[in-house]
Every structure is written in structure tokens, then in C-alpha cells.
Amino acid sequence: MNFYQDLGFLVFGSRLKRLGDTFINDVNRIYKDHEIDFDASWFPVFYILSQKKEISIKEISNDLKVSHSAISQLISSLQQKGFIKSVISKKDARHKAITFTVKGEKLLQKILPVWNALEKAMSELVEESVNSKKILKALTTIETGLHDKNLFERIDAHL
């Protein structure tokens, strides 16, 4: 008996969390084994900065659909480590923006090959099964459905 598989949707969230934790732990092991001072939890901010070069905390929060407070805490931590800095926005001098420091840019260059390898490894994993190929589309469908009507409302309707 496989506990998680047998319980189906009752443990769907637990399975996703367990899978996510496994991915994060393995990726962090890669960074550590390759002596790269990076934590997978920093990925969203680093990725967005790698694409946009300069962005406000509010824009990051909106892009990631994460609270302003959570992003501010992560930004503060990355600033203390010397990877990013706050600057006057080039778009609007009345606002501040976040950008990489030289140290952050150097770290980005070290982690880009890991991101490429990660994307290849995940693509290979998904290619191992016809069902796996549908997972990203299925996740998007679930996320959209939850945006339309959250899980609390869906459960409460059955009580």
C-alpha cells in the first residue's frame, strides 16, 4: 500500500509539498556540492532580476503573487549578504528599485549553468512518462481554478 497514492485527492497538497521539498533539497545539494553560495528559496528574485535587471519590490510581489512583506524580508536578507542593492529607479526617480551588486552578478554567473542543468534534468524526468508531460498544463489549470474559487470556498460548499 502506498499511503499517498491510495488517499488520492485527500493528500494532494501534501504530495505536492513533499515533491516540492524533494526538488528544493536536491537543488540545494547541487549548489552546496558545487560550492555555490546560493539557496533555492532565492531563485524567484534572482531569476526576475536576471531578466529585468532593475525592479521594484512591489513589481516582484505582483509578479510572484506573494505578499509585499515576504518579498521585503527576502530582499533584506539578500541585501545583507551583499547580492542586491536598492537604487533610485531609472523609470521613476521618486521610487526605489532593486538591482544586483557586482557580487550578485558574479553569483548569477555561477548559478546560470545550474539552472540550465535543472531545466534539462526536469525535462528528461517528465519525458519518462506520457502522463508526466501533462503536468505543467494540469498545474496551470488547477491554479486558475483556485484563482476563480479558492479551496476554502470549495470545501465549505460541501459542508
Language-model segments: residues:
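N-terminal helix-turn-helix DNA-binding core of bacterial DNA-binding proteins
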Residues: 25-67
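Charged, amphipathic alpha-helical coiled-coil/dimerization segments
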Residues: 76-137
